[in-house]
Amino acid sequence: MVQPRTSKTESPASAPGASAQMDDVVDTLTSLRLTNSALRREASTLRAEKANLTNMLESVMAELTLLRTRARIPGALQITPPISAITSNGTRPMTTPPTSLPEPFSGDPGQLAGFLMQMDRFMIFQASRFPGEAERVAFLVSRLTGEAEKWAIPHMQPDSPLRNNYQGFLAELRRTYKSPLRHSRRAQIRKTSASNRAVRERERERQMLCRQLAAAGTGSCPVHPASNGTNPAPALPSRGRNL
């Protein structure tokens, strides 16, 4: 009896089916990888947009805080009494001495010293209007414009330590807008002081040498007073002049 050869006849038919299934699996994996890559790019774009929106929100909140400060302080700083406060006989009630508002500071280093002087004078005459550090900082910021105002915006945020620290705010303002002319003058003063010290040191050495020559009897050398730093020390006497 001849056995049927079913296994050999089915084998060629099953090979194309397996190959088709493998192709489907490969296509599915490729599609998943492409989808995953697209989702990652979209997520990265969304994160960048979120960071940008967060920065914009922080900037808007800081500007809003600054605008609120500007709106609150000038209204409270009324230098002269209103018309309704004038009495019937035309006299004004006793008030604090009139003081003009400090000129706005836009970031010019050459104007910083004058601006801070005006601020100090104003706050001295209107001390009752600044009960705390926050009010002093807020008023100073209200007189900033241009580049200086942009610099102050981050320091007016709620988490800024300088918002309630007037002296710290002044120190940071001076560090940011320090005058180059003032620093050049300080450098010149330090250079002149060092030169004066060198002149005085040479004068002390000259006097010591004169004493040693006089004690040894090798020659006389008058002891002059120490130089004050403005004129050079007298030259040592030369023994070869009489030769």
From Swiss-Prot:
Residues in the signal sequence: none
Region annotated Disordered, chain positions: 1-22, 84-105, 218-243
Tissue specificity remark: Widely expressed.
Superkingdom field: Eukaryota
InterPro entries cross-referenced by the UniProt entry: DUF4939
Pfam name, any one: DUF4939
Family that this chain belongs to: Belongs to the LDOC1 family.
Misc. comment: RTL6 is one of at least 11 genes called Mar or Mart related to long terminal repeat retrotransposons. They do not correspond to functional retrotransposons, but rather to neofunctionalized retrotransposons genes.
Protein name stated in the entry: Retrotransposon Gag-like protein 6
Native source species: Mus musculus (Mouse)
